[in-house]
Amino acid sequence: MDEERLSDNVRLYKGGSIRQGLRSFAAVYVLLALSFLLLTLLSSVSLARIAALSSKLSTLQSEPKHNFSSRDSLLFPCGAQSRQWEYFEGRCYYFSLSRMSWHKAKAECEEMHSHLIIIDSYAKQNFVMFRTRNERFWIGLTDENQEGEWQWVDGTDTRSSFTFWKEGEPNNRGFNEDCAHVWTSGQWNDVYCTYECYYVCEKPLPK
């Protein structure tokens, strides 16, 4: 009798322990699930805040650049990287500080994505005269292809365009004066192409 009672007590104890263990496991599972949900919620909120801050930062960073660009275009219409260029009537001009032959000057202009100046109006002629007075500057005019047929570097023939030759020029003195420059008076003169003088480059406004 005592043995049966002891056996029943053992079974009751084991059953109670199992139920208690199951209840403890369920509680732990619920706590873990709640913790996971809480972490997920916090992560979502954090990511949303980070995205909002990144968006604001991008806006703040872009605004000064825009303002600087607008200010820069007013101060330097030919471009922030072309501050040595001068603006005149919708185009940009570079007046060199060194002397060289006509062909070297032409190559220098082309390296700067421009060309030797084409003077096709009184307004541009006056602009060049004012800037080049008392000095000689190459312009983009030559008759190397055909003697006496002067053409600009873009192929324009001077017979149907503006000219401003010095009196008595072009005269091909010495039979080798095939390139034109602006004389000290501002008028044009033909001279041999290996002569070294300053030069003027021309290019359109940057887009």
UniProtKB/Swiss-Prot annotation:
A GO CC annotation given for this chain: external side of plasma membrane
Protein localization: Membrane
InterPro entries referenced in this protein's UniProt entry, alphabetically: C-type_lectin-like, C-type_lectin-like/link_sf, C-type_lectin/snaclec_domain, C-type_lectin_CS, CD209-like_CTLD, CTDL_fold
Residues exposed to the Cytoplasmic side: 1-23
Membrane-spanning segments: 24-48
Membrane association type: Single-pass type II membrane protein
Keywords in alphabetical order: Acetylation, Disulfide bond, Endocytosis, Glycoprotein, Lectin, Membrane, Receptor, Signal-anchor, Transmembrane, Transmembrane helix
Classification via PROSITE patterns: C_TYPE_LECTIN_1 (PS00615), C_TYPE_LECTIN_2 (PS50041)
Post-translational modifications: Some or all of the cysteines are involved in disulfide bonds.
Domain C-type lectin: 77-203
Protein name per the record: Hepatic lectin
Protein source organism: Gallus gallus
Lineage: Eukaryota, Metazoa, Chordata, Craniata, Vertebrata
